[in-house]
Amino acid sequence: MKFVVWPSEIDSRLPRKYGRLVKKEVALEAPTPEEIRDAAEILGMKVIEFEPEKLNPRLSGIDEELRTKGMLRIESPYPKGKSLRMICEKIRELRAKKRKAHGKRKKR
C-alpha cells in the first residue's frame, strides 16, 4: 500500500482536528521527517518520496511552533494506521537509544 505521511499525523501536540491520526498515547512530540524516514526504512517500508520542507496544508491556521514540515510517500505492506503506529514505536525506540548513548558519554 502506498500512502503519504505527514509528521503532523503522529505529533502528540496536535489535536485530531489538525490531522493527528494516531492516539495521543501512541503519538510523539515533534517528530521530524528524518526520524520518520529512518524508522520506516528500519521497518522495511519503502520511502518513495521525501520532501522535508513541504508543509501540510491543514496546518496553515495554527501557531508557527506547531507547524511541522515534511512529507513522505511510503510503500508498506501494512495499512496506513498500523504503519503509523509501528513508525511511532520505532521512533520511540530510536530516541531512547539516542538518550541512552548520550547518557553513557556524559558519565565518562
UniProtKB/Swiss-Prot annotation:
List this protein's GO terms for biological process.
SRP-dependent cotranslational protein targeting to membrane
> Where in the cell does this protein reside?
Cytoplasm
Q: Which InterPro entries match?
A: Signal_recog_particle_SRP19 (IPR002778), SRP19-like_sf (IPR036521), SRP19_arc-type (IPR022938)
For whether the record's keyword set contains Membrane, the answer is no
**Which intervals of the chain form a coiled coil?**
none
**Where does it primarily localize?**
cytoplasm
Query: What keywords does the record list, in alphabetical order?
Result: Cytoplasm, Ribonucleoprotein, RNA-binding, Signal recognition particle
Q: Which Gene3D superfamilies match?
A: Signal recognition particle, SRP19-like subunit
* Annotated GO MF terms: 7S RNA binding
Identify one Gene Ontology CC term for this UniProt entry: signal recognition particle
Q: Which family does it belong to?
A: Belongs to the SRP19 family.
User: Could you give the subunit structure recorded for this chain?
Assistant: Part of the signal recognition particle protein translocation system, which is composed of SRP and FtsY. Archaeal SRP consists of a 7S RNA molecule of 300 nucleotides and two protein subunits: SRP54 and SRP19.
What is known about what this protein does? Involved in targeting and insertion of nascent membrane proteins into the cytoplasmic membrane. Binds directly to 7S RNA and mediates binding of the 54 kDa subunit of the SRP.
What this protein is called in its record is Signal recognition particle 19 kDa protein
Q: Which organism does this sequence originate in?
A: Thermococcus kodakarensis (strain ATCC BAA-918 / JCM 12380 / KOD1) (Pyrococcus kodakaraensis (strain KOD1))
Starting at the broadest rank, the lineage of the source organism is: Archaea, Methanobacteriati, Methanobacteriota, Thermococci, Thermococcales
User: What is the gene name?
Assistant: srp19
